Amino acid sequence: MSNRIEFDTAETGLRAVLKDYPEIAMKAIWESPEGLGSKVVWDKANERLKGKTISRASIINFLEAMREMGVLKGVEITGKGGHRWIYSPAMTEPQFKTFIAETILGNLKRDFPEETRRAIANVS
C-alpha cells in the first residue's frame, strides 16, 4: 500500500479503502492499543485469512504506510535480533473513518468544487 487512499465503490465499510489483510492488521492494532510488533500482526493476519497467506513484508509495508500517514504510531525498540517497530493506533477506528471521509471529500472539493457541493446537497 502506498501513502494514498483508494476508494473501491464496489465495496462497503472499511473494505472500500482496505483490502483483506490491511483490514485485519488495523483491527488487530485497534484491539491492542498498547501496540504490536509486525510479527504478531502478521501471525494474526495469516490466522484470520483462513487458507490464504500474506508475506511479512506486505504487512510491514502496510504498517509503515499507515505510520507515515499518521494513522499509526510507531516506536522503534532494540531487542534480540536487532531493531523492530511496535505499532499502536494514532487514530481510533471512528477517527480513521472520519480521516478517510475528510480526505476523499477534500480531494473531491479540490478537483470538482461545484459538482461536489451539488452532490453533497443532493445526498443530504
Predicted regions and their residues:
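Short alpha-helical segments that sit at the start of domains
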Residues: M1-K27, S32, T92
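Short acidic, hydrophobic short linear motifs in intrinsically disordered regions
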Residues: G35-A45
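A short, conserved structural fragment
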Residues: R67-I77
